[in-house]
């Protein structure tokens, strides 16, 4: 996809995005013309300064048919047997990191080649840098003497007034700039102090677009149907705006039986930005799998930061550390690891929406390890139950639904990666009332305001339907609202082939499906019970004494007594009250649930505290049955 195609993707894309996109190719074309001229110059190898081509080179360097030379006075050193011209400099936004120089040559078989030489790598491992240049066809010599002059040449190039490329650590929006890196394609109107935008490392090949936006829209319009697929499209687009909207990572997990089309939902969502083919069918397919190591999955997520990530088959993940992995995934940061020298490695980070699939929900997966969804994760890890009928049109048979799904699977391996680019290009082309292009801060405020309006709209409709949302559910609703905002804009801009009302209906269906799934909602009482259970298991021996043992040592932090016959735990009411208070729960609420599950012995119906019938002991207790220590809270409550 080139700059001319960019503005033809959708109406309203500003011409400045075309112009920025063309800068690198125009610059390299300019350098190529210098190379073509230099390679035809016959220079005197004993005195290259007399006839050699110095255009585009640092002082004292010359190109000619015999290659690249350094010459100063009587000192003449051949740096390369092929001509070399520096194209551009690269560095990070603070102009202190990721410094490198792009060098162009005409290699031994006549092909023009550009290689970026990292100053850091040159200092750490010059032999590896030279080997890479040689492998690409640069005629650089491996002699130690000449190598020193090559290093000086590269450092001299870094001081030249060459075009400056901004190195982005990851894809996505550039902080403070109306610029976005999508794969290796910059979508920008301009960047202060820089001429172009490049990735820190080569983007995954499946992110490069295939087909056309018109072709993709036809496939989606004819074959995509139902709220899960439309919601996947909206959340995939919303993922690109997380930073501007002031939000962090969200995981939308689609779960259901084996014939509900979960994987197709991921394919539809991924096709917005990258190869949406069947997982495992081609090396370029961008859908990840849960069946991998934590480290590998975290690294893969970082490679899709700024776009969207899709992970298939949660059931294939079999490590008992799922709770820890889920925490890392939704926090956007990998576990801190050390390198061979015991120094901290550079943190692996990501920020995007993650679409996931599996036959069980996130809470069910946690429950299989006797864990449960924590309060801080409910608004980040959202399980959405999908049913076979969700993808069916009215009156459509099962065979017809399957046929459309098969068509999607096949076509999305050919048509992908254009809608996301068109959406961002159109987003960056928005104008103020006076016709001026919106700045980064104005775009950020606009998407925040739009998301707030969408959130209020969703909340009002839910309230009219009788839903009462908790604070955590309100936070999750903002994530759905961003999906509505992004999907609505894409529909209005004719990037999604659906009416805005269809987008709204799909988001509202997703919200209702989530709220109606009571078993998979965060339960603060269950969290309090888990904490109490863990506290009792770990520390009961140090804080409880037998009820009838008059000679037993009484600990300073005394929690209560053990029943002489049943070994039940008779917990002092103030101790139990304090545990519940730490989790913002009332003691009666927790005790009632324990009693209902037959894990608490009440004094009488509705009265959960008991007084010990022992003249030597005073106080009020909650009698927790011994069996509570071994129950599966996630499954039983």
Where are these regions (language model features)?
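Phosphate-sensing "switch" segment of ASCE/P-loop ATPases
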Residues: 348, 370-490
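AAA+/P-loop NTPase substrate/partner-engagement loops
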Residues: 265-310, 314-320
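Loop/turn-to-beta-strand initiation segments
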Residues: 305-308, 350-354
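Conserved Walker
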Residues: 333-349, 365-371
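Conserved glycine-centered beta->alpha loop in an early N-terminal alpha/beta scaffold
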Residues: 2-224, 299-300, 304-307, 367, ...
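Structural recognition of the conserved hydrophobic beta-strand(s) that form the central parallel beta-sheet
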Residues: 351-359, 383-384
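DNA transaction DNA-binding modules
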Residues: 164-223, 434-637
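P-loop NTPase catalytic core of nucleic-acid-dependent motor ATPases
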Residues: 190-281, 480
């Amino acid at each position: 996809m080139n700059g001319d195609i960019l503005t033809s993707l959708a109406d309203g894309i500003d011409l400045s995005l075309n112009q920025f996109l063309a800068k690198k190719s125009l610059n390299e074309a300019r350098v190529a013309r210098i190379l073509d001229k230099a390679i035809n110059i016959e220079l005197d190898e004993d005195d290259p300064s007399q006839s050699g081509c110095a255009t585009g080179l640092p002082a004292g360097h010359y190109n000619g048919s015999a290659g690249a030379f350094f010459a100063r006075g009587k000192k003449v050193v051949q740096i390369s047997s092929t001509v070399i011209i520096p194209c551009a400099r690269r560095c990070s936004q603070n102009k202190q990191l990721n410094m490198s120089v792009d060098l162009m040559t005409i290699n031994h078989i006549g092909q023009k080649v550009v290689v970026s030489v990292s100053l850091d790598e040159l200092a750490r491992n010059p032999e590896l840098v030279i080997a890479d240049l040689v492998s690409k066809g640069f005629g650089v010599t491996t002699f130690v003497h000449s190598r020193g002059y090559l290093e000086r040449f590269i450092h001299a190039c870094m001081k030249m007034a060459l075009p400056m490329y901004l190195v982005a650590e990851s894809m996505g929006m550039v902080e403070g700039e109306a610029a976005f890196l999508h794969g290796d394609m910059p979508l920008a109107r301009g960047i202060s102090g820089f001429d172009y935008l490049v990735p820190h490392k080569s983007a995954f090949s499946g992110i490069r677009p295939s087909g056309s936006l018109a072709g993709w829209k036809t496939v989606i319009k004819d074959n995509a149907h139902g709220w899960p697929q439309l919601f996947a499209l909206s959340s995939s687009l919303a993922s690109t705006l997380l930073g501007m909207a002031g939000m962090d990572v969200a995981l939308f997990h689609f779960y259901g039986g084996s014939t509900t089309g979960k994987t197709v939902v991921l394919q539809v969502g991924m096709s917005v930005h990258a190869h949406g083919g069947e997982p495992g069918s081609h090396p370029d397919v961008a859908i990840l799998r849960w069946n991998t190591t934590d480290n590998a999955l975290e690294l893969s997520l970082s490679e899709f930061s700024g776009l969207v990530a899709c992970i298939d088959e949660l059931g294939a993940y079999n490590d008992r550390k799922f709770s820890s992995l889920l925490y890392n995934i939704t926090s956007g940061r990998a576990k801190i690891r050390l390198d061979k020298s015991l120094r901290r490695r550079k943190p692996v980070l990501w920020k995007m929406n993650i679409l996931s699939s599996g036959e069980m929900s996130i809470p069910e997966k946690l429950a299989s390890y006797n864990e449960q969804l924590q309060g801080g994760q409910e608004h980040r890890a959202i399980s959405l139950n999908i049913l076979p009928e969700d993808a069916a049109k009215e009156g459509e048979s099962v065979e017809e639904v399957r046929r459309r799904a098969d068509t999607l699977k096949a076509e999305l391996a050919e048509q992908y990666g254009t809608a996301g680019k068109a959406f961002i290009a159109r987003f960056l082309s928005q104008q103020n009332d006076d016709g001026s292009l919106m700045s980064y801060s104005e775009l950020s405020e606009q998407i925040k305001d739009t998301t707030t309006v969408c959130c209020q709209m969703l909340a009002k409709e839910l309230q009219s339907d009788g839903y009462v949302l908790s604070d955590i559910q309100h936070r999750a609703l903002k994530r759905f609202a961003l999906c509505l905002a992004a999907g609505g804009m894409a529909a209005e801009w004719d990037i999604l082939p659906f009416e805005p009302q269809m987008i709204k209906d799909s988001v509202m269906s997703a919200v209702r499906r989530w709220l109606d799934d009571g078993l998979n909602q965060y339960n603060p009482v269950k969290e309090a019970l888990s904490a109490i259970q863990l506290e009792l298991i770990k520390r009961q021996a140090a804080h409880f004494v037998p009820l009838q043992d008059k000679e037993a040592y009484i600990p300073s932090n005394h929690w209560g007594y053990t029943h002489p016959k049943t070994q039940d735990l008779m917990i002092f009411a103030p101790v139990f009250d304090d545990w519940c208070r730490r989790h913002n729960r009332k003691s009666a609420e927790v005790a009632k649930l324990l009693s209902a599950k037959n894990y608490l012995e009440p004094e009488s119906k509705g009265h959960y505290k008991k007084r010990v019938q022992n003249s030597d002991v005073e106080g009020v207790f909650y009698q927790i049955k011994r069996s509570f220590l071994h129950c599966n809270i996630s499954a039983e409550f």
